[in-house]
Amino acid sequence: MTETPIAPQEVPRVIVLVPAYKEVDSLPRVLEALRAQTRPADRVIVTLDPHTDSRRTAELERVARAGGAEVWHSVGNRHKKAGNLNGALSRLLPVVSDQDAILVQDADTFLDPQFIEVTRRKMAQGYGAVGGTFRGRSGGRLCGAFQRNEFARYARDTARKKGKVLCLTGTACLFRAGALKEVLEARRSGLLPPAEGVYDTKALTEDNELTLALKHLHHRIVAPTRATMTTEVMETWPALAKQRLRWKRGALENLIDYGLTRYTTEGWARQLVAFLGASVSTAYLVSVVWFLAVGAGVRIAPFWIAFTAFYAIERAVTVKSRGWRVSIASMLVLPEWFYDLFLQGVHLRALADTALRRDRAW
């Protein structure tokens, strides 16, 4: 099929790509949220990866067309979301203007009405890519509640830093088409790590890797406070551990691929801080268990009482956007602390898997 080139226009277009595989339940609301945008997209394309159950693929196509979207099908894709997007972008990029914007969003993420308007306005200020912050959907019981608190703290931290982020979110992000074309060319020329397309299908976290690629081509990125959305949470602890292991190992491997540069320094520093934090927590737990085992008992020093009080207040203040009930519940130190320990344990596992070159899968 031959695409008709889009003639340059005064107002750049916004084209949405929604890669989908099995999201039959969420896709209708995704498309509804896109139709409700204060600055509607000029074009919405749902790009389908064939499911092993052909009925599910057919249902996704029906839902997409009913929601007013175009439907594309990936062909011969073996690399999940990244491969699906690479195939779609290989069709799309040659026929769009460099100033057009391409919004890539997950098929289980619901954009708030102002998302496109806010990100498009920000991109007009010279940014190569504009992301956002997200809230967690309901569900998942205690596991989901911790994630919703975590997302609220991330949004608060991003707002405090005026949109500065280490990594663009893969849930929804607006890219300047010209920036993606530069990434593709830089991969071919060897200026960036080689890949089969815009997204590196070898990376566990393709969104993190693309962020590094854009930065190394000197594109600015940002996540405006008002660019918000709602996305899924992992509903079980094993699912959360699997997700975070992929995120943490993928981020570490991306840093290794790019080495130590002006754009990776902060990432390496965060890796070091996370490792030190996990090490201190491990040492603390081991020492407590040891003292209890030998019958020495545990004496709580005034310093630790003060530190615990500070931790409780910090936990409450950083989730106040979720309401006073959540803030009060967050002051229960032990549940929040155990969630931190859980994430630190996953981080140590990611370090070990990377060092030992264990199989990479998700």
State where each predicted segment sits.
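Short, acidic, metal-binding catalytic loop of nucleotide-sugar glycosyltransferases
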Residues: 32-41
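Cell-envelope/extracellular polymer assembly enzymes that use nucleotide-activated donors
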Residues: 12-15, 43, 209
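Catalytic donor-sugar/metal-binding loop of nucleotide-sugar-dependent glycosyltransferases
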Residues: 208-229
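Short beta-strand-to-loop acidic/aromatic patch adjacent to the donor-nucleotide binding site
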Residues: 95-110
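Long helical/loop segments within the catalytic core of UDP-sugar-dependent glycosyltransferases
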Residues: 75, 80-97, 113-203, 245, ...
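Short beta-strand/loop segment that forms part of the nucleotide-sugar
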Residues: 42-52, 72-74
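Catalytic core of nucleotide-sugar-dependent glycosyltransferases
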Residues: 150-155, 241-261, 312-314, 346-352
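Membrane-embedded multi-pass helical conduit in multi-pass membrane proteins
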Residues: 272-358
